[in-house]
Amino acid sequence: MKKKLLSLLLALCLVMALVPMTAFAEENEQSSKTSITTVDELLQFAKAVDNGEYDDKTDAVVSLDADLDLTGVAWTPIGSVFAADGTLLHYFSGKFYGNGHTISNLDFSENYGKTEYPSFGFFSEVYGAEISGLTIQGKLDVSNSDPVFFGTVAGVAADSKISDCVSDVSFTDTDKYINGTVAMCGYAINSTIEYCQNKGNFSVMKDTSQFWMGGIAGLAENSTIQYCANTGDMTSWTPSSGGIVGQLIQNSKVINCYSTGKIAPLGKGTTDFGGIAGIVGAGTEIRHCYFAGEMDLSQYTATTPYKRLGGIAG
C-alpha cells in the first residue's frame, strides 16, 4: 500500500512539474507573436525585418489575421536590405502563418529588376523560416532588367519550409532582356515546398540566356517539392521552364505533383521545356507526377539538338 501511495505521489509531482513548463512555453510563444490585420501593420513588420529584428529569430511567430488589399503600394520585399556587394544584411527566419488569408493587388512591377533588389518577392530571402497558409494575388509587368531571383512568396528560401500557399500573380515581360527566375519561390535551397499551387500566367516574350521558370520553384537545390500543382500558362523564350520547376539540381525531388497549364515555347534557340521540370540534373528525382496541359509548338522553330521538350522533363 505504501509503495502504491508513493508511486501516485511521484506521478502527481511529475504532472505538477510539467504543467508550469507547458504554460510557460505557451506564454513565451504568445509573447513573441505578431498579429497583422492592416496594411500599416504589414509595412511595420516589413520595416522591423529590414532593421534586423527578425534575424535568426526562429521562435518568432507572425500571424496574418485579415485579408489585405495593397492597391497603390509600390512593393519592396520584406527583408530587402543588401550590402553593396549584394550580400543580404537582414532577413526573416521565424514562422509566418497566413491562416488562409489573401494579400491582393500586390504590384511587384515598380521595384523589380533594380540593382538594390537582387532577390525579390513578398519576402526577399528567408532563412530557417516557415511560411504557410498564404495566398498572394497580383502582377508584375517587367520594366527593369537587372538579374533577379524572383518568387511571388520568396525570392530565395534557404533551410525553410513553404506550405499550403497559393500564388495568383501574372508575370509579363514584353521587351526586356532579363535573367533570374520566376516562380512561387525563385530559388529553393535545402528547403521543402508542399501543398502549394500556382495559378498565375507567366509570359516572357524577349530572348533570355539564363532564366529559370517554374510554377512552384525556378531553381531547386537539395530541396523537395511535393503535393504541389500548377494551373497557370507559360509562354516563354526562357531556356529552362517547367510546370512545377525550372531546374532540379543536387538531390532535389519532385513528388506527387501535377501541372495542367498550357506551355508554349518561343523562338528557335536552345530550350529545355517540360510539363513538370525543364532540366533534371544528375541525382535528382521526379516521382508520381503528371502533365495534363497543352503543349503549343506553333511559335517554336528550333531544331534538334536545340529542341528539348517533354511531357515530364525537357
Per-region residue spans from a language model:
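Positively charged n-region of N-terminal signal peptides that target proteins for export
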Residues: M1-L5, L9-L10
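A generic membrane alpha-helix/interface feature
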Residues: L6, P20-M21, D56
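C-terminal segment of classical bacterial N-terminal signal peptides
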Residues: M16-F24
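Surface-exposed repetitive/solenoidal architectures
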Residues: F24-G314
